[in-house]
A protein has these predicted regions:
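Charge-dense, helix-prone N-terminal extensions
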Residues: 1-118
């Protein structure tokens, strides 16, 4: 994997929790049980990270980076997968993680957001 910082970065996000879903062979990063990132593999066994993005941002990134594809086994309008052996720059991937985390956090009730953010 080209992103050894990935696990630490995802877990540094406010309210982030991690588990492993054995049936999917995937590590999931969640906020109060709502997924914001999932690390697993595609059918060829290539490592991927799947993230939620606004549709327009996802389309633009997919047009500019061959290692970013529509979300693997996810809603392809809102989710995008990044090949972790690819060449997406660290700052681009970190921005994608930040956006995914923010979208999920903002989808939670305001009371819960306040608890998470302190």
């Amino acid at each position: 994997m080209n992103y050894p910082w990935l696990d630490t970065y995802c877990l540094s996000k406010a309210g982030a929790e991690k588990d492993y879903k054995e049936e999917w062979a995937a590590t999931r990063y969640m906020i109060r049980g709502k997924l914001f990132a999932m690390q697993g593999g595609d059918k060829e066994g290539r490592a991927i990270l799947t993230l939620k993005l606004p549709p327009d941002q996802g389309r633009l990134l997919r047009e500019n980076y061959p290692d970013i594809i529509p979300g693997y086994y996810m809603n392809k309008e809102h989710w995008n997968s990044v090949y972790l052996e690819g060449s997406v720059e660290d700052d681009v991937l970190q921005s994608m993680i930040d956006t995914s985390h923010r979208l999920i956090l903002e989808s939670l009730p305001k009371r819960m957001q306040k608890e998470i953010l302190g």
